[in-house]
Amino acid sequence: MSFSKKYPHLFEPLQVNQMMIPNRIISAPLGSLTDKSVSGIGMIIRGTSGSVPGPRSRMAPGSYCFANMQESQKVREQVVTIQQRGAKAEFELCHVGQYAYVQPGDYAIGPVGFVREDGIEVKAMDENMMNEVADAFAKGAVDAKEYGFDMVMLHFGHGWLPTQFLSPHYNKRTDGYGGCFENRVKIPIQIVER
């Protein structure tokens, strides 16, 4: 049996709101987009760990982020290449929270404060920090639209900052952002609503 007969819907277009994706094959933000864009994939996701603008959002230095304006022309060219070859371009926004790569003397942020094994301080986020992070996600989404991306994905998995708030393992807060699920989900909801 042929692949297309075994999975007939895989190669059908998919309507998402006003956007039509040419098929249901979506590529994660890994590897070379040039190779992917000639392969017939319906949507190619770009982004990296810590793509939300800000000094404490990245997993490693040099992460793919709009905050680095030297990348701007390269990003626009990549989006155009993806779209010219018939695929849709999606940008993945994520913030790594307590796992952030920071400069010596700086700190990471998370639901609770502690010192990591590498000696980096993680500061418990106050409401101002929470608002700054939600604003940074919103700015990243606006930037993605300005760069020509067709869609934005908010990456709340892999233990990144929103998941750190959702998880009772990481979130030991005793205020209105910890404890029951309704409290722990407040920051992810705030990010989505921005």
Region annotations inferred by a language model:
Residues M1-R194:
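Flavin-dependent oxidoreductase catalytic cores
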